[in-house]
Amino acid sequence: MNTAIQAALDHVVQSLQQEGILPSDWNNNSTLTRTKDRSHGDFASNIAMVGSKAAGMKPRDLAEKILASLPEVADITKAEIAGPGFINFFLNADQRFAVLDQIQAQGQYYGQTQVNAEKKIQVEFVSANPTSSLHVGHGRGAAYGMTVANLLEATGAQVDREYYVNDAGRQMDILATSTYLRYLELLGQPLVFPKNAYQGDYVKEIAQSIIDKDGDAYVRSVADVYRNVPEDVQYAEELDSEGNKVVLSGDKEKHIDGLIANSQQLIGQGYRVFHQAALKAILDDIKDDLADFGVTFDQWFSEASLTQKIDEALQTLDQRGYLYEKEGNIWFKSTKFGDEKDRVVKRRNGQTTYFASDIAYHLDKLQRGYTHIVDIWGSDHHGYIARVKAAIDAMGYDSSKLTVLLVQFVSLWRGGEMVQMSSRSGQFVTLRELRQEVGNDAARFYYVMRKSEQHIDFDLDLAVSQSKDNAVYYIQYAHARICRMLEKANSTQMRFNQTQARQFANRLDLDAETEILAKLAAYPDILVRAANAYEPHQIGNYLKELAALFHGWYNEHKVLTEDVELTQARLLLSVNVQQVLRNGLDLLGVSAPEAM
């Protein structure tokens, strides 16, 4: 129905432009939305307020001209001006019941549209370094990215989900060397484990798997491994005034880099055994963890596969005049495209930078023919946006194709206290631990219930509580309640008959029932808005509101009554609520239980 109203308003704009009331180049960015207050009709447009300045008249005066030119719209009984210049549209009574037919006909597909059918979108998300298990921060990116992809697909887009595997960087070398040092320890070689190495027990498990397969084939003298390696960092026993460690001597970065270099030299090709064993073990763990979380990918893209693409990207930038040499390094002129400073893409030792890999990766994405590229990054990567967009423009592509969505950090709270989390020390709360504590449903739901750029305080106690304060429980309970109601009805002579029930829909004449019908009809619009804004929380909030309307109505009004017609009508309304709840929960990756 909103499509028909919008078409009528578009017709009015053309007429007013022809009459010279609105400029011929006026861009209509007004909105047509469902009203929250039934006394204001079913739909409201702000077109008169948006266009008043361009028309050079007061909003209400322009609204009168709009109404005078408005063609007849089927099933609209009246349109009137309200407040500062809103135009409210009222549906006839029969049209309010049309949503019941739409939901019954479309079932699990109700709400889905083809508004983004011409888009081919790649959504890259999580992309955590394969150096340890996923932590709760990665979990938010996983839930958010998967749900954004679901929403885009539900609005007709062709979507590819991709995980970028950072399998060629320094962190992988730190992990490989950490594994090698644990390997030496397990084979009886005493050593002082580096402070900057990966500390978790999983490193020992990977090392043991290599021992089980190859024995002591890679054992070398610890003295040789540590030969000429800069001193590791030494900290004072007491913290400074801000609670930070005080460095007395040494350098943890130079220390681990020295160990990496020595390990590579001493065991030669054997180093790859540790690198690949660690990569496979961690990546398999990540894949299993995400699959159990309901998060899947169409492609796992290896950074190591980009060698030739890096050369191609840098050659393209050079040919277009955007590279220069300074102090032995090769720099990209990113400041020409709005970045705050130029960026190194190749160091004087010939090694390309992580940024060079990023440029090559985005070149590869663009060459795959996507109309839109969506990158979902941790908020700490905010500074990378300008330089990546600069590189895209410099290579001759359109950086507006790239949308970067930042995901803020997550804090866990239990018993009113924040749960501490860190990484290399091995003392971090994993996604798997969170899922085991609160369940997949609560994790998937609460991870997306705020805008991605907003911090989340995840209340573990609330997430497992069985109360209306726990939104996911409240929504799921509404679904289960309807299942139980239908089961009870079908066990008696009040068995639900959909065809018969539709004949009695006009018995749904309570204000609460009219409100539920309007809320059901609003779902497709909410879905489109949520998809185009990359805001899954809009679906979550909608489901909370729909569940609240249903619970309130159910608690106040008996569904299974002695009146057969009324019972059938109310069961019909309940069944449609059930379907929409299930559809919305499915998009969020949350189950719709039949019993609770």
Swiss-Prot record:
Enumerate the subcellular locations listed in this protein's record, separating them with semicolons.
Cytoplasm
Say which domain of life the source belongs to. Bacteria
Report one GO cellular component: cytoplasm
Q: Which InterPro entries match?
A: Arg-tRNA-ligase, Arg-tRNA-synth_N, Arg-tRNA-synth_N_sf, ArgRS_core, DALR_anticod-bd, Rossmann-like_a/b/a_fold, tRNAsynth_Ia_anticodon-bd
Q: One GO MF term, please?
A: arginine-tRNA ligase activity
Q: Give the residue ranges of motif 'HIGH' region.
A: 128-138
Q: What EC class is this?
A: ligase
Q: Which GO terms fall under biological process for this protein? A: arginyl-tRNA aminoacylation
Q: Give the keywords, sorted.
A: Aminoacyl-tRNA synthetase, ATP-binding, Cytoplasm, Ligase, Nucleotide-binding, Protein biosynthesis
Record's subunit section: Monomer.
Q: What is this protein called?
A: Arginine--tRNA ligase
Taxon lineage: Bacteria, Pseudomonadati, Pseudomonadota, Gammaproteobacteria, Moraxellales
Q: Which gene encodes it?
A: argS
